[in-house]
A protein has these predicted regions:
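Structural motif
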Residues: 58, 135, 160-163
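Helical hairpin unit composed of two closely spaced alpha helices linked by a short loop
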Residues: 159-178
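The Walker A/P-loop phosphate-binding site
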Residues: 11-109
Length: 178
């Protein structure tokens, strides 16, 4: 019995990582540094910020300082550079057609005029926006319902980003009191 106990291989501890477990990744990091992340295509911003899939990004600032507009620009950049599709749960960007128009302008690169309606460029941009940007419209936004709809959009439409704007307008649970 003593010989068997001495010769037994220890069972690895759950949720514990040793240096040897990640040594290959450490060697790669020492030799190559951080792998470049995804960038939005804004030179000065890209010099200081890049992201990776699976990250949770919070954009903060004073009210009416352009946070939503900047996030929209980031999303259009990720779409242009990497083909990322995005869903928006954006209770403050109502009515939805105004937010859709903001995204269209960013994809268009300018403000389309009434003469542009139904032109070839108009139709191309509309098709692009229709297949790449999705608006989650709910009467009450709860974190659970938004994340559930986001998961559906991952499976059905292939979204890579879910924007919740503003996060403080999304309740953590379905509170019917107020």
């Amino acid at each position: 019995l003593t010989a068997r106990i001495t010769a037994a291989t220890p069972v690895p501890l759950e949720n514990v990582t040793t240096f040897r477990d990640v040594e290959g990744e450490v060697v790669d990091f020492v030799r190559n540094g951080f792998k470049p992340g995804f960038q939005v295509g804004l030179r000065n911003f890209d010099d200081i910020f890049s992201t990776y899939t699976g990250q949770f990004i919070t954009v903060t600032g004073i009210p009416s300082s352009g946070k939503s507009d900047f996030v929209d620009q980031m999303i259009v950049g990720y779409n242009k550079n990497y083909g990322w599709k995005t869903a928006f749960a954006s209770p403050e960007n109502a009515p939805t057609y105004l937010h859709a128009h903001k995204l269209m302008r960013k994809v268009w690169g300018d403000m389309p005029s009434s003469a542009d309606v139904h032109s070839d460029k108009w139709n191309d941009v509309v098709d692009h926006c229709n297949t790449n940007f999705f608006h989650i419209d709910m009467e009450r936004y709860t974190l659970e319902s938004v994340l559930k709809k986001g998961a559906e959009l991952v499976k059905r439409k292939g979204i890579k980003c879910l924007v919740i704007d503003p996060f403080n307008k999304v309740r953590s649970t379905d509170q019917s009191g107020d």
